[in-house]
Structure formats: C-alpha cells, structure tokens
Amino acid sequence: MGSVLGLCSMASWIPCLCGSAPCLLCRCCPSGNNSTVTRLIYALFLLVGVCVACVMLIPGMEEQLNKIPGFCENEKGMVPCNILVGYKAVYRLCFGLAMFYLLLSLLMIKVKSSSDPRAAIHNGFWFFKFAAAIAIIIGAFFIPEGTFTTVWFYVGMAGAFCFILIQLVLLIDFAHSWNESWVEKMEEGNSRCWYAALLSATALNYLLSLVAVVLFFVYYTHPASCAENKAFISVNMLLCLGASIMSILPKIQESQPRSGLLQSSVITVYTMYLTWSAMTNEPETECNPSLLNIIGYNTTSTVSKEGQSVQWWHTQGIIGLILFLLCVFYSSIRTSNNSQVNKLTLTSDESTLIEDGGARNDGSLEDGDDVHRAVDNERDGVTYSYSFFHFMLFLASLYIMMTLTNWYRYEPSREMKSQWTAVWVKISSSWIGIVLYVWTLVAPLVLTNRDFD
C-alpha cells in the first residue's frame, strides 16, 4: 500500500517535468511570476554544473576520470595526467553547458510572448532539457583531443571577456538601483540616517580601493622588472579618479540626476579587482605573489614529476566565482527600471518582481488555492529576451571554465601556466568597463535628441 502511495506521489511531479510551469521550484517557494521562476531554475542548473566542475578538480576524482579510454592519450611523458585530467574535464563539462545554453539561445530568437510555441520549451519540459544537457556533457568527454583544448581555450577567453563586461553592466545597474533606493528613503524621512548610510557606503568603497592600490604597489611592483604592473595600477587608478570626478560635474548631474559617487565607487572597486586579477595571471611568478603567500601561508599546489607547480585554487578565482554567482542570480531576479541598462541587456522596462503583488488574476491562481504556482505574466509580451538570457549563460559557462582553470593554457613545452593574453583580456575589459560607465554619464549630453530617462 505504501509503495502505491509513493508511486502516486511521484506521479504528481510528472506534469512539473513536462508542463509549462516550473512547479518544481514553485512547490518550495511562494507563488511568483513565471519569468522570474524560470530564470532561477536555469541559474540553479548552471550552479549545479559549477559544483560538478569543482568536484572534478578534486584529486580523488582524477583517478576515476583517468579510467576513461583515451582521455589522456598522447600526453604521457609531457604533462602528468594527474594534472591534466582535471583541466580537461572542466573544459569538457563547460563545453557541454555552453553548447546547451547556446542551442537554447538560437532556438529562442525573436520569441515575443509566452503564446509562442517555443516559449513552452523555455518555460517547461525541464526533464527533457536537462536530460539533453547531460547527454551533451557526456558526449563532450569523448571528443578527440586534437586541437580541441587549444581552440576552446581561445573561445573561452573571448567568452569570459564578454561576460566580464556583462558583469560590469549589471554592476552599474545594481549601483543605480542601490543609490535610487537609499535616496528615496532619505527623501521620505529620517534623511540624516540614510544620508550617513549612503556616505558611509561610498567612503568604504573608496577606502577599499585605496588600500588595494597601496597593496598593489607594495607587493606587485617588485622587483623593478614588474614595469607592466606599475603601468596597470597607475593607469586604472587615474581612470577611476577621472570617472569619479566626472560623475559629480554640474552638467552631468543636470542631465543624469541618478549619477553620483556611490556608483563610481562601486565601479572603482570592481576595476581594482580586475587589475588584481590580471596581475595574478602574469607568467612571471615574482610579479604575481598569491594572496595567501603575502599574508604568510603556503598555497596548495599540484607538483608534477618535472617539479612543475600548478596551483588550481587562487584567491582571485574564488572571488571570481562569488562575483559570478551574484551576477547570474541578480540577472535572474533584477527589477531595474534603468532604461539604458535594460536596452543593453534586452530587458523590458517593466519590473518583473514588483508585479507579483498586482499580477492579474486570470485563473492561474485561484482564491483559497494553497498550491504554489508560477503566474504567466508574459502573455502580452516577454519581460526579458529569452535568447539574450541564454546567451548570457553561455558566456557565463565560458567564464566559469576560465576561472576554475585559472586561465591556464596547456603548452607543448611541458608547462601549464597563464599567458599574457589572459592578462591583457582582463586589463582591456577593465578599460572598456570604465569607458562604458563614462558613456552612461555623457550620453545624454552627446545624444541630445534621445530620451535617456
């Protein structure tokens, strides 16, 4: 009897696996908009992939992966498999994830509303989609080595570069939303308290940036041969200073009332992080001491028979993972009305979460119904671009691949280490990021015939 009841209970989940409403998550969470719940499920699936990739770097997993026929062929005697297997496994796992999201991105081009038949694939059929993703990942492990790793390294680097820029756009959006929220509360009442909070947050960001610059000059510019680091630190410091001054100019304030030092302080902190991340990827080890070595601890490395040391877990990599998680989940629940950012991310100006309280009662939720459901709030039009969202997750998969492997590239010269290419990718992304932020400030002054409200 118990078995029959158990089967009936399991059968009740079948509509969730195949239907259009992502009720797998809704059963655990309050009722919400379909547009938000769907994005959260895709983000959670990517998070599971990240966790599996991290497990694949654990030494205990390497022996199991080594049992795959031909997985380490032609590498014997050049780079030990106990180093290379984890590296290749992460590449193949992220390749599968990236292809899954890229296929969905192509499939969802120009979906305008949930009435489009393709929207049902986006918002439902979870079992079949995830089964397909797992099949793609498994198939990726049987791709012949050849030039796959080298080619995918450069593809991953380009994708990670684009995702860093998306991170910056979302960071600008977050800073604007943060500033607007606190300014509104300051105007509503208790202005001194909220003004102090706003000032404290801004001062803290600039203080962290100043401390970072000092530490960079102390630990990353010696010996004298580390001239590139001196240039990177100095240039980015001056660029951040210029952007901060520009954000409070009278003309900028007149055309962009939302601009201020809080946003520029957030951008400054992120730019300092990118500068640090770039310097830790320099091939010359004397110019890029790890954070743990700086504070007096030894980092864990994998040492090959040739005495080569490959350190898989860097502090900047861990911070990169944290930023990645915050970025992906923020993009899944963001409610910004910033029109400039919404145009860049192809998102509707309408809020996707605030509508929960005022969602139309069209039968999706019945009075007295205790079942948690997702309300279809996209019948008249989608609140975000399905295609762009999946493309962002495609880029996120590449960013994770590069972060987990510390931007290492396998070299036939029996070495696995970072390249100057990785350094310039990160530094150039920091420069482009500052240019993008400055453009959000000056665009209303340059393009006077356009509405930037």
From Swiss-Prot:
UniProt keyword list: Endoplasmic reticulum, Lipid biosynthesis, Lipid metabolism, Lipoprotein, Membrane, Myristate, Phospholipid biosynthesis, Phospholipid metabolism, Phosphoprotein, Transmembrane, Transmembrane helix
Keyword Transmembrane helix included in the entry's annotation: yes
Iron-sulfur in keyword set: no
Lipidation residue positions, type N-myristoyl glycine: G2
Function in brief: Enhances the incorporation of serine into phosphatidylserine and sphingolipids.
Residues where Phosphoserine is found: S351, S364
Subcellular location: Endoplasmic reticulum membrane
Recorded topology in the membrane: Multi-pass membrane protein
GO biological process: phospholipid biosynthetic process
Organism: Bos taurus (Bovine)
Protein's UniProt name: Serine incorporator 1
TM ranges: 40-60, 89-109, 124-144, 152-172, 198-218, 232-252, 260-280, 310-330, 388-408, 427-447
Any one GO cellular component localisation term in the record: endoplasmic reticulum membrane
Lumenal side: 61-88, 145-151, 219-231, 281-309, 409-426
Phylogenetic classification of the source organism: Eukaryota, Metazoa, Chordata, Craniata, Vertebrata
Entry-annotated residues carrying Phosphothreonine: T352
Cytoplasmic-facing ranges: 2-39, 110-123, 173-197, 253-259, 331-387, 448-453
InterPro entries in UniProt: TDE1/TMS
One family name in Pfam for this protein: Serinc
Domain of life, source organism: Eukaryota
Subunit and interaction comment: Interacts with SPTLC1.
Family per record: Belongs to the TDE1 family.
